[in-house]
């Protein structure tokens, strides 16, 4: 591990896309995940992400269990072997639906706790579902911070372009709907066999509505996006095949 202090964070665009998709999956609760990458010369380079299942849905806070941290560490070890470079958990992210991008006192305390284990650990906050006062349009803000003597300190952040979406980010994107469905199933299980018939009907209706919501905002758009990418890749393949044939004719001619 590099002992230098954190000076800058580089976030790959495919990781940014996954985090943002997760943040936009619900405007009623905060969501969270863990960031994986490598750290060297004061720069944290984030190239993978793990979406965490919410153990308890709360509007104003999120929590990471020790089991989830262990799972993330195991995934980092797996990526170390797969990519043949050192990978580890570099930080966490969570959403602020309808509220400021600034870290709350709880966020700062949580961040300080993580930094006691790793001084270079960083936090990202995605402020979503906010409306501009003048434009009245949907705005998204991103804050990168650490805790310093009980106060939030902003860390320079650069979003680094990646020409393609990595396989690991694609897997994470497709896992999102599964995780959200599992959260709803866990909540439904807790309310199962309610003695009040009307309450039971209401709970089932809420569950059905939640599952439809997941399909509409996550699964269906993701399928449509992948279908468009497949069509585009086919066009590119056809174009490259034609170029290859022309070059072969020139060489043979």
UniProtKB/Swiss-Prot annotation:
Localization terms from the record: Cytoplasm; Nucleus; Cytoplasm, Cytoskeleton, Spindle pole; Cytoplasm, Cytoskeleton
Gene Ontology molecular-function annotations: cysteine-type deubiquitinase activity; metal ion binding; metal-dependent deubiquitinase activity
Enzyme Commission number, as recorded: 3.4.19.-
Keyword Magnesium: no
InterPro entries: BRCC36_C, JAMM/MPN+_dom, JAMM_MPN+_peptidase_M67A, MPN, MPN_BRCC36
Keywords: Cell cycle, Cell division, Coiled coil, Cytoplasm, Cytoskeleton, Hydrolase, Metal-binding, Metalloprotease, Mitosis, Nucleus, Protease, Ubl conjugation pathway, Zinc
Protein origin, superkingdom: Eukaryota
Listed GO biological process terms: cell division; DNA repair; positive regulation of NLRP3 inflammasome complex assembly; protein K63-linked deubiquitination; proteolysis
Domain MPN, residue spans: 9-145
Effect upon mutating residue 99 to R: Nearly abolishes metalloprotease activity
Extent of motif JAMM motif: 94-107
Coiled coil: 227-249
Cofactor note: Binds 1 zinc ion per subunit.
Gene Ontology terms: cellular component: BRCA1-A complex; BRISC complex; cytoplasm; spindle pole
PANTHER family, per database record: EUKARYOTIC TRANSLATION INITIATION FACTOR 3 -RELATED
Role of this protein: Metalloprotease that specifically cleaves 'Lys-63'-linked polyubiquitin chains, leaving the last ubiquitin chain attached to its substrates. Catalytic subunit of the BRISC complex; does not have activity by itself, but needs to be associated into a heterotetramer with ABRAXAS2 for minimal in vitro activity. Plays a role in regulating the onset of apoptosis via its role in modulating 'Lys-63'-linked ubiquitination of target proteins. Required for normal mitotic spindle assembly and microtubule attachment to kinetochores via its role in deubiquitinating spindle assembly factors.
Subunit structure of this chain's protein: Component of the BRISC complex, at least composed of ABRAXAS2, BRCC3/BRCC36, BABAM2 and BABAM1/NBA1. Within the complex, interacts directly with ABRAXAS2. The heterodimer with ABRAXAS2 assembles into a heterotetramer. The BRISC complex binds polyubiquitin.
Family as reported in the entry's similarity comment: Belongs to the peptidase M67A family. BRCC36 subfamily.
Protein name (record): Lys-63-specific deubiquitinase BRCC36
Species name: Camponotus floridanus (Florida carpenter ant)
Lineage: Eukaryota, Metazoa, Ecdysozoa, Arthropoda, Hexapoda
